[in-house]
């Protein structure tokens, strides 16, 4: 494919990239949750701790506080200690989960920015699409920026238009 033919399909390339980035942005929370589940195996330990606490509470309900106060108090302290340990564990896991989601989000937005910058760099002086200049007469210079081609649609304007159209189309799915 020649350079001229590649430039002819530039509008579709940019639209595809914008569409893909917006779809990925919608799927980002699900992907982050999946990755955090894959990277964290602590939920099994937490469920085991919850089961132990439940068993101890069950045992505590069978102990008479008046007759066996020492055993009752010891079991109650053990339950409190295990509950505190579980709370600490859950807080640590939640903090790690937030960190994983933040890293994935930042990585996505950095890649998206790099992609958009590379598209702007590639099509800076070439119009993404050329339309009859009378279609965009009052705004022709603004729409053509930075190409300065009469009737041309510049990359920055095209990215803005694509983002708006894709956002409207994908709104029901987000």
Curated annotation (Swiss-Prot):
Question: What InterPro entries has UniProt attached to this entry?
Answer: Get1, Helix_hairpin_bin_sf
Q: Where is this region: Interaction with GET3/TRC40?
A: 39-97
Against Pfam families, the record matches this protein to: CHD5
**Chief location of this protein?**
endoplasmic reticulum
- The UniProt entry's coiled-coil ranges are 39-94
Task: Give a yes or no for keyword Magnesium in this entry.
Answer: no
According to its record, how does it sit in the membrane?
A: Multi-pass membrane protein
Annotated signal peptide = none
GO biological process assignments: establishment of localization in cell; otic vesicle development; post-translational protein targeting to endoplasmic reticulum membrane; protein insertion into ER membrane; protein stabilization; sensory perception of sound; synapse organization; tail-anchored membrane protein insertion into ER membrane
Show the Gene3D superfamilies listed in the entry: Helix hairpin bin (1.10.287.660)
Which GO cellular component term is one of those annotated? endoplasmic reticulum membrane
| Keyword annotations from UniProtKB, A to Z | Coiled coil, Endoplasmic reticulum, Membrane, Transmembrane, Transmembrane helix
PANTHER family documented for this protein? GUIDED ENTRY OF TAIL-ANCHORED PROTEINS FACTOR 1, TAIL-ANCHORED PROTEIN INSERTION RECEPTOR WRB
- What quaternary structure, including any partners, is listed in this protein's UniProt entry? Component of the Golgi to ER traffic (GET) complex, which is composed of GET1/WRB, CAMLG/GET2 and GET3/TRC40. Within the complex, GET1 and CAMLG form a heterotetramer which is stabilized by phosphatidylinositol binding and which binds to the GET3 homodimer. Interacts with CAMLG (via C-terminus). GET3 shows a higher affinity for CAMLG than for GET1.
Q: What does this protein do?
A: Required for the post-translational delivery of tail-anchored (TA) proteins to the endoplasmic reticulum (ER). Together with CAMLG/GET2, acts as a membrane receptor for soluble GET3/TRC40, which recognizes and selectively binds the transmembrane domain of TA proteins in the cytosol. Required to ensure correct topology and ER insertion of CAMLG.
Report what the protein is called. Guided entry of tail-anchored proteins factor 1
């Amino acid at each position: 494919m020649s350079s001229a033919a590649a430039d002819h399909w530039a509008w579709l390339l940019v639209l595809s990239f914008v569409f893909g980035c917006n779809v990925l942005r919608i799927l980002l929370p699900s992907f982050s949750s999946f990755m955090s589940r894959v990277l964290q195996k602590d939920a099994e330990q937490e469920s085991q701790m919850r089961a132990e606490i439940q068993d101890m509470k069950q045992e505590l309900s069978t102990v008479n506080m008046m007759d066996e106060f020492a055993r009752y108090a010891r079991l109650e302290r053990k339950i409190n200690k295990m509950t505190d340990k579980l709370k600490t564990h859950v807080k640590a896991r939640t903090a790690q989960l937030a960190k994983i989601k933040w890293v994935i989000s930042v990585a996505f937005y950095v890649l998206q920015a790099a992609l958009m910058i590379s598209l702007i760099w590639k099509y800076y002086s070439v119009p993404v699409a050329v339309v009859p200049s009378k279609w965009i007469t009052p705004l022709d210079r603004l729409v053509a920026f930075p190409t300065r081609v009469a009737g041309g649609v510049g990359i920055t304007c095209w990215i803005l238009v694509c983002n708006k159209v894709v956002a409207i189309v994908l709104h029901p799915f987000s």
